[in-house]
Amino acid sequence: MPSLLLVVVAALLSSWAQLLTDANSWWSLALNPVQRPEMFIIGAQPVCSQLPGLSPGQRKLCQLYQEHMSYIGEGAKTGIRECQHQFRQRRWNCSTVDNTSVFGRVMQIGSRETAFTYAVSAAGVVNAISRACREGELSTCGCSRAARPKDLPRDWLWGGCGDNVEYGYRFAKEFVDAREREKNFAKGSEEQGRALMNLQNNEAGRRAVYKMADVACKCHGVSGSCSLKTCWLQLAEFRKVGDRLKEKYDSAAAMRITRQGKLELANSRFNQPTPEDLVYVDPSPDYCLRNETTGSLGTQGRLCNKTSEGMDGCELMCCGRGYDRFKSVQVERCHCRFHWCCFVRCKKCTEVVDQYVCK
């Protein structure tokens, strides 16, 4: 009997490990440094087999495009940082855990937060690959070949080395979507609904980067007269991409899977989402309390703002449990003076301030 129990427990642990692996665990490239291209032999499969969290399709792409992998890791890291910035004042603050799932069990729930995380990480990959192309780091791409904008003045030159957002978009689509596309779920199943949700949000993230890329120009001429301009395509600051996706998070559409294997609005009174919108299939879990099942870390010990009425305020952040006050010593630059020529000298001032943490 004990041996049978051990078998059952082992099976449950195995299936749970598989669930964690099935999460979007290519994100783990952000936490594990990927060797630079010059550090390994082109076509050497062991390098890709040693990278944690890749699906079979992603592993094949790794073998074909090994020099891209460090930039995929950079893109994932950029996405995680932006997620943590955007949610820094929310109950769920995009915390990472120390395993290949990166965000833990909370990503197994098809919530708004999961939708944002998929979108912003896909956006990070587009951003990193596009820039690597421009900087000459990848052998398969170079500067942007985007067509000259029709509204660009005739006497302005088009052809500076721009960010190759077209290539970045295409490669990110092929790599990031591989995990969802290589699976064959039963039509109308919850698993298929979740896969379609992930694909929609991946696309929304990529499109945010693609659509927000804009023309940048540099002046040429005697004494800065700007008699001539050279222009190129340039990525938007990633913070602006994050802001755009946060707006999409706030207006994300609740969806459900149909028997025909398509996502439809859970409430038909709302507008159909566009490819640039975020969607979700599950309600968000309770982020107030720590819950091992849902992966919620809770808000106990989180800093809160006593005077704010927003999500960062102690009343909302602490979910009505109350908060503790403690004294904190902060060191800041003060009494700064400009000295000729040319530097600024400051003193260091210490201040004891009250801070508050959730019970």
From Swiss-Prot:
Gene3D superfamilies assigned to the protein according to its UniProt record, in alphabetical order: 3.30.2460.20
BP terms from Gene Ontology: animal organ morphogenesis; cell-cell signaling; chondrocyte differentiation; muscle cell differentiation; negative regulation of canonical Wnt signaling pathway; positive regulation of cell migration; positive regulation of convergent extension involved in gastrulation; positive regulation of fat cell differentiation
Lipid-conjugated positions (O-palmitoleoyl serine): S223
GO cellular component: cell surface; endoplasmic reticulum lumen; extracellular matrix; extracellular region
Record protein name field: Protein Wnt-5b
Glycosylation-annotated residues: N93, N99, N291, N305
Recorded family membership: Belongs to the Wnt family.
Post-translational changes noted in the entry: Palmitoleoylation is required for efficient binding to frizzled receptors. Depalmitoleoylation leads to Wnt signaling pathway inhibition.
Protein's cellular compartments: Secreted, Extracellular space, Extracellular matrix
Pfam families: wnt
Chief localization: secreted
Residue pairs linked by disulfide bridges in the UniProt entry: C83-C94, C133-C141, C143-C161, C217-C231, C219-C226, C288-C319, C304-C314, C318-C358, C334-C349, C336-C346, C341-C342
Subunit structure and binding partners: Interacts with PORCN.
Top-level taxon in the UniProt lineage: Eukaryota
Keywords from the named record: Developmental protein, Disulfide bond, Extracellular matrix, Glycoprotein, Lipoprotein, Secreted, Signal, Wnt signaling pathway
Secretion signal, residue range per the UniProt entry: 1-17
Organism: Mus musculus (Mouse)
Keyword Ribosomal protein (UniProt): no
GO molecular function: signaling receptor binding
Function: Ligand for members of the frizzled family of seven transmembrane receptors. Probable developmental protein. May be a signaling molecule which affects the development of discrete regions of tissues. Is likely to signal over only few cell diameters.
